[in-house]
Regions:
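Periplasmic-binding protein-like
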Residues: 193-198
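Short, well-ordered beta-strand segments
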Residues: 16-20, 68, 125, 171
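Hydrophobic hinge/microswitch elements
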Residues: 52-56, 61-64, 71, 132-190
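Short beta-strand-centered segments that line the small-molecule binding cleft or hinge
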Residues: 32-36, 53-96, 100-104, 160, ...
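N-terminal winged-helix
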Residues: 4, 8-41, 45-58, 73
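Secondary-structure junction motif
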Residues: 101, 107-144
Length: 198
């Protein structure tokens, strides 16, 4: 379908495709995607629009973008969806949090696992409503049947991790994001469970 859209655009006087992408993902994906696309379709302009998950869905439904690249766990009616990858969700705790004593290793996985039951009534620092990670966090809370004692909402992952780093609460992150966050030396990461993807 993608190649078909591009082929149709090639016959126009100013061929272009419009791609919506999550703000956080744009940092790592746009340069690589654009380079490959320009090699294959040098005459087609790519117009990127960024936003959070809710904004991207609105753009797509209104027809202001042709494609979206995002973390999307729910089905969208009448939409062709291609899964590019699955990405693990990580729990982020301050390095001296007492729940770390309950962490356990599973096989050769790069991070230990931690049961969320040990974090009931804790302070969680989470993304804003409309962000894909917020949707994931809400699902994780529901599945684990825990209730945060306090929620602090922040729209930027770097700010969330900086708050976890100084012990203000617990956060969540994606495996693909943490390679840019090595500066947070006092954050310890844990897998939540085997099904905590997207």
């Amino acid at each position: 379908e993608f190649d078909g859209l591009v082929e149709n655009e090639l016959h126009r006087s100013n061929p272009a495709i419009r791609v919506g992408i999550q703000q956080r993902r744009a940092i790592s994906i746009v340069p690589e995607v654009l380079q490959r696309f320009m090699e294959k379709y040098p005459d087609v302009e790519v117009i990127f629009r960024d936003g959070n998950q809710a904004e991207l869905m609105k753009m797509f439904q209104e027809g202001s973008v042709d494609y979206i690249i995002s973390v999307c766990s729910e089905e969208i009616p009448d939409v062709v969806r291609t899964e590019i990858a699955r990405e693990r969700v990580l729990l982020a705790l301050p390095e001296h949090h007492p729940a770390i004593a309950h962490a356990y290793q599973v096989g050769n996985e790069p991070y230990p696992h931690l049961d969320l039951r040990y974090l009931d009534r804790e302070t969680f620092i989470i993304p804003m409503a409309g962000q894909s990670m917020r949707m994931t966090v809400n699902r994780i809370f529901q599945q684990a049947r825990i209730r945060p004692g306090r929620l602090i909402e922040i729209g930027h992952f770097d700010v969330i991790m900086s708050m976890v780093n100084i012990g203000l609460g617990i956060g969540f992150n994606r495996l693909g994001y943490i390679h840019d966050m090595q500066k947070f030396e006092h954050v310890r990461y844990f897998f939540v469970d085997h099904d905590a993807y997207r």
